[in-house]
Amino acid sequence: MAAKDVKFGRTAREKMLRGVDILADAVKVTLGPKGRNVVIEKSFGAPRITKDGVSVAKEVELEDKFENMGAQMLREVASKTNDTAGDGTTTATVLGQAIVQEGAKAVAAGMNPMDLKRGIDLAVNEVVAELLKKAKKINTSEEVAQVGTISANGEAEIGKMIAEAMQKVGNEGVITVEEAKTAETELEVVEGMQFDRGYLSPYFVTNPEKMVADLEDAYILLHEKKLSNLQALLPVLEAVVQTSKPLLIIAEDVEGEALATLVVNKLRGGLKIAAVKAPGFGDCRKAMLEDIAILTGGQVISEDLGIKLESVTLDMLGRAKKVSISKENTTIVDGAGQKAEIDARVGQIKQQIEETTSDYDREKLQERLAKLAGGVAVIRVGGATEVEVKEKKDRVDDALNATRAAVEEGIVAGGGTALLRASTKITAKGVNADQEAGINIVRRAIQAPARQITTNAGEEASVIVGKILENTSETFGYNTANGEYGDLISLGIVDPVKVVRTALQNAASVAGLLITTEAMIAELPKKDAAPAGMPGGMGGMGGMDF
């Protein structure tokens, strides 16, 4: 086992504090509408430019192991906030640094670290309750756009696009962000349920120009096994032909004579038909077939349920107003499923999302939820250069997460003002002087984001903070973008409560642990062994010239 270096007390805390400061100072320059960019070297390709706090935090690795431990602990604040709220990582880092700095001073002055931490926790709980009480629910598309605009660093076009996407696919719908192939940023919305399986044969195409198969008012047969035997299919095909409606077959696979017969019938014009493979794999495939069945009001034909293909009747088939099938995707629009059944299925999937511990499963469940609940929107981010596109994509991701958080828990005045106001409302009392000191640490620390935003804009923070606090209106604050005071909510300068709350809770949690640290252990660097000596000359080689 390698030898370890152990540092205690003040020496350990000073090293750790230095690491915290290095990471926080690199991150906090990005805060606010006038925050600056950070350039990150990449081992290959162009450097990356970003204003995203967590992206900066993840790149910081320090040479000194003790300093690095402090930096990594603070990085955890940014990462955890990003995982929970998806935005507010810079605010969380600034709060973490402020609490650690104030706490370290108090510990150096001889206060008990555990009591300080208890005081910090008391104050944080009160501030969180105050934020939730003051939260304003957002209802209109304009309010959604405002939140998106602020998080995208004042870019109104992005805010508007996110609001439009949310309006079209609903709050449960999936909105993904991709890099565009062009310089324009655009929004594409796919309504209905789409899955990534295309037609099994190009002969099913109804529109040769676009190479898509469009089926209007179609029946849908859902089968979980392979279809290769034509005899079993005949009763269904005959029943559908009588109705002169098109038929879509979704099965594990359709092959052999079954596929050949379907293609021949389609080409002769006797039967409007198309076949696609079922989406997903294994258990996920069964679940997705069930989803499609509920959406279209049909049944999954499965021998597990004792239903044989030969005995299928028309009322077991799903229905949809329109089905569009391309080479890669199938979209089912306006299925005939009962709303109550779809809602029950959505509730069931939400329950599974809460219970699952696997990130992969959660992602798949959320995809299924979106497909059932409304649709999928894709925001394609464009730019003149690859570096610009990547930087913009970071901002769109943040804006999207902030908007979702705002819809969930509501909004408060932005620009750090909500925390600034909360600092004057803390009434918690500690059981001793050290806990009181912990409460005061939070009072001072939660002013840090507002001060940092104004400092980044080149303003004098103390003057502006003083002026804001002189006014008693909850929403009165300072608009750093244009240097004016006013009602921040009506100006559209807002923060999602979930983002502010999560940032504060995570910052206090990690900062509390850092303050109560008394010893640090790190591996000593290995000493390089001395190089081996040169071997002696070989005998019997005299008389040779070199």
From Swiss-Prot:
Gene Ontology molecular functions: ATP binding; ATP-dependent protein folding chaperone; isomerase activity; unfolded protein binding
GO process annotations (BP): protein refolding
NCBIfam families registered for this protein in UniProt: GroEL, PRK00013.1, PRK12849.1, PRK12850.1, PRK12851.1
Keywords: ATP-binding, Chaperone, Cytoplasm, Isomerase, Nucleotide-binding
Catalytic activity, EC: 5.6.1.7
Lineage of the organism: Bacteria, Pseudomonadati, Pseudomonadota, Alphaproteobacteria, Hyphomicrobiales
The family this protein is said to belong to: Belongs to the chaperonin (HSP60) family.
InterPro entries: Chaperonin_Cpn60_CS, Cpn60/GroEL, Cpn60/GroEL/TCP-1, GroEL-like_apical_dom_sf, GROEL-like_equatorial_sf, TCP-1-like_intermed_sf
GO cellular component, one term: cytoplasm
UniProt cross-references to SUPFAM superfamilies, sorted A to Z: GroEL apical domain-like (SSF52029), GroEL equatorial domain-like (SSF48592), GroEL-intermediate domain like (SSF54849)
Gene name per UniProt: groEL
Predominant localisation class: cytoplasm
A Pfam family: Cpn60_TCP1
Protein name per Swiss-Prot or TrEMBL: Chaperonin GroEL
Gene3D superfamilies assigned to the protein according to its UniProt record, in alphabetical order: GroEL, GroEL-like equatorial domain, TCP-1-like chaperonin intermediate domain
PROSITE patterns, per the entry: CHAPERONINS_CPN60
Ribosomal protein among keywords: no
Reactions that this protein is recorded to catalyse: ATP + H2O + a folded polypeptide = ADP + phosphate + an unfolded polypeptide
Top EC class, one word: isomerase
Glycoprotein found in the keyword field: no
Binding residues annotated for ATP, in chain numbering: 30-33, 51, 87-91, 415, 495
Described function: Together with its co-chaperonin GroES, plays an essential role in assisting protein folding. The GroEL-GroES system forms a nano-cage that allows encapsulation of the non-native substrate proteins and provides a physical environment optimized to promote and accelerate protein folding.
Provenance organism: Brucella melitensis biotype 1 (strain ATCC 23456 / CCUG 17765 / NCTC 10094 / 16M)
Quaternary structure annotation from Swiss-Prot or TrEMBL: Forms a cylinder of 14 subunits composed of two heptameric rings stacked back-to-back. Interacts with the co-chaperonin GroES.
